[in-house]
Amino acid sequence: MIIIISGLHGTGKSTIGKLLADYYKLEYYSTGQAFRDLAQKKNMSLEEFTLFVEEHPEIDYELDKLVLKYAKKGNIVIDSQLGAHLLKSSVNVKILLTCPLKTRIKRIVERDTSNFEEKLKETLLREKSELDRFKKLYNIDLRNEQIINELYDIIIDTESLSIQQVLKKIILELEKKF
């Protein structure tokens, strides 16, 4: 089984992805974590690394190759913005988590114990950079509602749901499909 979980920063995709992987006894891979790890290796903040990656598309290509590599192995939950676009029909289920910006930033601040304004600025920069890079590199528009509705099997707004409620909704949907 291959499950792709996508969503903007702070929607809950990493938390839910890890819980799904545990529940179904699957591996878990996160491109977001790989991105953060690369930033740390280069001794850069996420903002600095985001700007660096804009000038070095090979980093995005390398991260996307890893998604394809892990997907080929199977039995995995992949947390990736582009995973559903890159893998399309070779995935069992594609999940998109959504949530309004203010709630997402509050979650990120709680997770990282940081400042709201700082995380808002960083997140907006990262998301704009990702949208621009993915459009330029792959001609993918992550905001296209028609493509979103056609591509994803499950779309959940996580704003007013607990982690357990989101997990339960996804598991119920997966049980209907399999």
Where in the sequence are the language-model features?
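Hydrophobic anchor at the beta1->P-loop junction of P-loop NTPases
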Residues: 5
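P-loop (Walker A) phosphate-binding loop of NTP-binding proteins
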Residues: 8
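Conserved lysine of the Walker
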Residues: 13
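Hydrophobic positions on the alpha1 helix immediately C-terminal to the Walker A/P-loop
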Residues: 16
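Post-Walker A helix-loop "phosphate-sensing" segment adjacent to the P-loop in P-loop NTPases
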Residues: 22-29
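ATP-dependent small-molecule kinase phosphotransfer cores
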Residues: 31-87, 101-102, 113-118, 124, ...
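Small-molecule kinase domains that catalyze NTP-dependent phosphoryl transfer to phosphate-bearing small molecules
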Residues: 116-169
